[in-house]
Design a protein with these regions (language model features):
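Donor-nucleotide binding loops and adjacent catalytic segments primarily
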Residues: 1, 152-210
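Active-site and donor-binding regions of nucleotide-sugar-utilizing enzymes
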Residues: 1-133, 146-154, 167, 171-172, ...
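Secondary-structure boundary/capping motif
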Residues: 60, 109-111, 139-142, 161, ...
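Charged active-site motifs of nucleotide-sugar-dependent glycosyltransferases
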Residues: 137-144, 176
Length: 210
């Protein structure tokens, strides 16, 4: 894969005027590059509705064919976006079965692909075995914390999670806590942010934690 623009540094926690400007600037760079230099036969947009729907307008005006994989969840919020999809997207590739009927009812060509995580899900975990494996108390309630998969998220929010969990534990001693360990982050990151807790840090078992 040829990486044209790196979006990894555009993540942000909370509201930031800078991120709005950065998104506008990146959108213009991508649109200009695709329409004036690269000129692809097909553009495949993936997720990221607020950003991709904006650049789809420019790309469509340039006569490009556009597919959208994991389109905006118009069934949950901002239903008006389906009009922009109908106008600028040639085909939607959806991951939920009911989305196919929804988009087709608005005259949008749609193909159901299935959810990419379904094939990866293991069999449901046995609760007693899971508790035993990780040294958890079967007589106490388990609270799972999913602090995010990016280092800056943990940097900004870990202290808040820890304080909130400890406050809850003081008020409700029957609670015990587990932290979901994102596979892309090192053990050292979690040791750094959760070293002063007795929380169990568990990697690769999100379904069981849920």
């Amino acid at each position: 894969v040829k990486l044209l623009f790196d979006q990894s540094k555009m993540g942000v926690v909370g509201l930031s005027p800078k991120i709005i400007f950065d998104h506008i600037l990146l959108g213009k760079k991508i649109s200009d590059y695709l329409t004036k230099e690269y000129k692809p036969d097909l553009v495949l947009l993936i997720d990221y509705g607020g950003f991709n729907l904006n650049i789809s307008k420019v790309l469509k005006r340039a006569g490009m064919k556009i597919f959208y994989y994991i389109p905006p969840q118009v069934w949950a919020s901002r239903k008006w976006r389906i009009n922009a999809i109908k106008k600028n997207i040639d085909e939607v590739l959806c991951i939920f079965p009911f989305e196919k009927g929804l988009y087709e009812s608005h005259g949008i060509k749609t193909h159901y692909c299935g959810h990419p995580l379904v094939a990866q899900l293991p069999a449901p975990a046995d609760k007693s075995e899971f508790f035993k494996k990780h040294g958890l108390d079967t007589n106490r309630k388990l609270v799972s914390i999913f602090p995010g998969s990016r280092d800056f998220e943990l940097k900004n929010l870990a202290k808040v999670f820890v304080k909130s969990a400890k406050d809850l534990q003081r008020k409700h001693p029957e609670l015990q806590f587990c932290i979901s360990h994102a596979p892309n982050l090192s053990d050292e990151v979690y040791d750094k942010y959760f070293k002063d807790t007795d929380f169990k840090i568990i990697k690769g078992e999100n379904q069981a934690l849920l």
